[in-house]
UniProtKB/Swiss-Prot annotation:
This is HPr kinase/phosphorylase. The lineage of its organism: Bacteria, Bacillati, Bacillota, Clostridia, Eubacteriales. Residues 261-266 are annotated as: Important for the catalytic mechanism of dephosphorylation. It catalyses: [HPr protein]-L-serine + ATP = [HPr protein]-O-phospho-L-serine + ADP + H(+); [HPr protein]-O-phospho-L-serine + phosphate + H(+) = [HPr protein]-L-serine + diphosphate. Residues 198-207 are annotated as: Important for the catalytic mechanism of both phosphorylation and dephosphorylation. Both phosphorylation and phosphorolysis are carried out by the same active site and suggest a common mechanism for both reactions.
């Protein structure tokens, strides 16, 4: 999903020096500092990127003679450039303005330091253009681990989230989870309308931050584990050792999935806490509980064989 120049101007409070064509889309999240291009090197040039002139490029132009500066800028603007942004509030060279006007291109200016501006705009564009989807579920932060709780309606996802909030964990979103894939990570957040709200059957919608404080909610969280609730089946084939890993694909990213059978009497919130703690343990340890049991069994068998 692209971003228009007008949207960029509004979100970054950019000063408009030269107005270009309306509704020009920005379709890539990378930016380019055209130092090499101003020196005359255009191999591998990406004109579709936002072009950013900072102190270094500005000083390079400043040291040129007016005729050379005009020549280099006319060449630069002969490409199909979406917009040019000058940082640090630097003065605009007259040759640059004239060349931009010929092509009806956007020239914008920011007071921010170049490196900080590039970092912010790259993150902004990556977020805006990231592939996204919406899933039904509840996203919570448990011990710093983003856990997406899924399952059919009425199975107890929201009630479990409420219990987790009472135990000091944090809610990201209930019912609808907006997910974006950014650099291989899945970032989940709440739709703006339902942010901070939790629907509990029999009670209705509650404002989590009002009842439990602002520390009980989060704007977004990276999804690490999927906890899928399903009704208990006596003949169900459930993983009892934790050796059969299951994954679910979301936007091309595989996420570990745990199936949790639900029946009266099970403390699901405690199980989810244990799953989060176990995830952290597995990330930090080279040995699993199953490996420990196998080692103990071998040691026990060796002792018995010596008797």
């Amino acid at each position: 999903m692209g971003v228009t120049i007008e949207k960029l101007i509004k979100d970054f409070s950019l000063e408009v020096i030269q107005i270009g064509e309306e509704n020009v889309p920005i379709n890539v999240s990378d930016v380019n500092r055209p130092g090499l291009q101003l020196a005359g090197f255009y191999n591998y040039f990406a004109p579709e990127r936002i072009q950013v002139i900072g102190k270094a490029e500005w000083s390079f132009l400043e040291d040129m003679s007016p005729d050379l500066r005009k020549k280099r800028l006319n060449k630069f603007f002969s490409f199909d450039i979406s917009c040019l942004i000058i940082t640090r509030g630097l003065e605009i060279h007259e040759e640059l303005l004239k060349a931009a006007r010929k092509r009806n291109l956007w020239i914008l200016r920011s007071d921010m330091v170049t490196t900080k501006f590039i970092s912010k705009i790259t993150m902004y564009l990556s977020d805006k253009m990231a592939p996204e989807t919406r899933l039904h579920g509840v996203l919570v932060d448990v011990y710093g681990i983003g856990m997406l709780i899924t399952g059919e309606s009425g199975i107890g996802k929201s009630e479990t989230a409420l219990e987790l909030i009472k135990r000091g964990h944090r809610l990201v979103t209930d019912d609808a989870v907006d997910i974006k894939e950014i650099d291989g990570d899945l970032i989940g957040r709440s739709p703006e309308i339902t942010f901070g709200m939790l629907e509990v059957r029999g009670m209705g919608i509650i404002d989590v931050s009002a009842l439990y404080g602002l520390s009980s909610i989060l704007n977004s969280k990276q999804i690490k584990i999927i906890i899928h609730f399903e009704h208990w089946k006596d003949d169900g084939d459930y993983d009892r050792l934790g050796v059969n890993d299951e994954y679910q694909d979301i936007l091309g990213v595989k996420v570990k999935k745990l199936r949790v059978p639900i029946r009266p009497g099970r403390n699901i919130a405690v199980i989810i806490e244990a799953a989060a703690a176990n995830y952290r343990y597995q990330r930090m340890s080279d040995i699993s509980p199953v490996d420990i049991i196998e080692k103990r069994m071998l040691e026990s068998m060796e002792k018995e064989s010596k008797i």
